[in-house]
Amino acid sequence: KLITANIELFLNYCDRFYDRQFITRDSVNKGILEKFEGLMNAYFSSDKPQNIGLPSVAYCADELHLSANYFGDLIKKETGKSAQEYIQNKIITLAKNKILEDHLSVNEIAYELGFKYPQHFSRFFKQHVGATPNEYRNSN
């Protein structure tokens, strides 16, 4: 029982220390969030979506020299959203802008954003926006 209690106490301290680092390193975390936003902008401004596909949490964490788990926890603490949700929101924002601004077809927009299949883009868009890309374009 004594060993179990000490292990439990140790793990509790580890958990508290892990959570505390997000509070004490607030300015550093804001910098990482800015770098993440810059990484997303650079990624979608380049030809990487067409060559690599959609960015993953692991890719972003690797580019920022962080572990995927730590990166995910950091983004969740700073934004209230998971890193995956953050990436998906970025894709939706870009898709909405391209649908309204560009005179590209939905297929071209899908490939430009890194989707392998336009059907996946349409399904993804409808899940997040509530309308298909064409419906969204026609309503705005």
Residue ranges and their predicted role:
Residues 1-14:
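Amphipathic alpha-helical segments enriched in hydrophobic/aromatic residues interleaved with Lys/Arg
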Residues 71, 120-121, 125:
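Short hydrophobic/aromatic patch on the recognition helix
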Residues 9, 16-34:
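C-terminal regulatory or interaction extensions
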Residues 123-140:
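…primarily DNA-binding HTH/wHTH and HhH modules…
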Residues 4, 26-66, 85-104:
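A short, Lys/Arg-enriched amphipathic alpha-helix from helix-turn-helix/homeodomain DNA-binding modules
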Residues 78-116, 138-140:
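Terminal helix-turn-helix DNA-binding modules in bacterial transcription factors
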Residues 58, 69, 105-108, 118-119:
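Residues within helix-turn-helix
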